[in-house]
């Protein structure tokens, strides 16, 4: 990594309460213990539990839980505004990890957008665009993807 990344900073991980997002959060705290880690999750209760697990594993105290529901573009906008005014160190990493797969009936969020598309794609697209002004030089944005929308897999997505 370049030396610019070694200064204090903030990493934001969406869906950091379980799975790949949690593993990513663990690794970030291991490699950059001086950074502030933002767990951006839909469920505050689950995010607080994840933060407690990270802290009990020696991750340090600079872990922040923030509410983010990617199914709601209003929630994404609120989150971006909160990041801008929170007084966090410069954002050096944004990991867009949160995602869902609904195999049952097709569902829609506000505005008539299919739920998995809203959460897995549009929410993260808006989030990344809104946070561009808050990113430090040499910051990284990582998008985690899946085969959820692969039409050959017939997973229930229209």
Descriptions of predicted regions:
Residues 2-158:
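Rossmann-fold NAD(P)H-dependent dehydrogenase/reductase core
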């Amino acid at each position: 990594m370049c030396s610019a990344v070694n200064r204090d900073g903030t990493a934001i991980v969406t869906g950091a309460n379980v799975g790949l997002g949690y593993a990513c959060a663990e690794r970030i705290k291991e490699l950059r213990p001086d950074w502030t880690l933002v767990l951006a999750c839909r469920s505050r209760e689950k995010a607080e539990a994840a933060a407690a697990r990270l802290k009990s594993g020696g991750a340090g105290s600079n872990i922040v839980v923030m509410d983010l529901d990617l199914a709601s573009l209003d929630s994404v906008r609120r989150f971006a505004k909160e990041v801008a005014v929170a007084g966090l160190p410069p954002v050096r990493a944004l990991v867009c990890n949160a995602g869902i797969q609904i195999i049952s009936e097709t569902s829609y969020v506000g505005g008539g957008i299919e739920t998995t598309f809203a959460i897995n794609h549009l929410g993260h697209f808006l989030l990344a665009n809104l946070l561009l002004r808050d990113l430090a030089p040499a910051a990284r944005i990582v998008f985690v993807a899946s085969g959820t929308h692969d039409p050959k897999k017939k997973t229930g997505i229209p």
